[in-house]
Swiss-Prot record:
The keyword Cell wall biogenesis/degradation does not apply. Part of the 50S ribosomal subunit. GO terms for cellular component: chloroplast; ribonucleoprotein complex; ribosome. This is Large ribosomal subunit protein uL23cz/uL23cy.
């Protein structure tokens, strides 16, 4: 999707589609406005709100198990959609949209 990397499948994220919300990891640099424009390029997708937070960076471990640095911090976006405007996650099911 350009800016949005992959959907998240945590316990909370699995329950979000019931409330027309979707959680995904995103590149750390784009703003909420840029991500909104990229997602709304899909036909019939309109966004009501975007919430984001930055995940903590983890320790990068070397070959001997010692900490050698930090991994890159990532951003997580929770997108709320308008009613009857789903994101096409699974092509081929219900006209390519998840309801």
């Amino acid at each position: 999707m350009g800016g949005v990397e992959n959907p998240v499948s945590t316990d909370k994220a699995i329950r979000l589609p019931e409330r027309k919300q979707y959680s995904s990891n995103a590149e750390p640099n784009p703003s909420k406005t840029e991500v909104k424009r990229r997602i709304e390029r899909f036909p019939r997708v309109r966004i009501v709100a975007i919430n984001s937070h930055r995940l903590p960076a983890g320790a990068a471990r070397g070959s001997a198990g010692s900490v050698t640095g930090r991994r890159v911090r990532r951003k997580r976006m929770i997108t709320t959609l308008r009613l009857n405007h789903p994101i096409p996650l699974f092509p081929g099911k219900q006209n390519g949209f998840v309801s």
